[in-house]
């Protein structure tokens, strides 16, 4: 499958639902920590879900730079492009 930013975002939004108990609308500008109250454990669980869904590895070293949904989609796209 050819992944576009929109398709990746759509899939990540689905994966985020268990971490979004308040049902906040997730946009590219959604702050994962402030808006969704994700802690480091939740973030690692999400990363594992993303790795399984997209069949990629997300280096832990990239996570401190991921604040928004847009950042997360960019990381996924970058890892997908590495094949």
Language-model features, listed with the residues they occupy:
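Phosphopantetheine-dependent thiolation modules in NRPS/PKS and related acyl-activating systems
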Residues: 2-38, 52-53, 57-83
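Two-component histidine kinase catalytic core, primarily the HATPase_c
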Residues: 42
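Residues within the DNA-recognition helix of helix-turn-helix
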Residues: 46
């Amino acid at each position: 499958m050819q992944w576009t930013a929109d398709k990746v975002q759509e899939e990540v939004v689905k994966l985020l639902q268990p971490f979004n108990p308040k049902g906040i609308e997730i946009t590219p500008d959604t702050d994962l920590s402030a808006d969704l109250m994700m802690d480091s454990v939740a973030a690692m669980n999400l990363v594992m879900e993303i790795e399984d869904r997209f069949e990629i590895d997300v280096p832990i070293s990239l996570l401190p730079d991921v604040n928004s949904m847009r950042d997360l989609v960019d990381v996924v796209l970058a890892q997908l492009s590495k094949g």
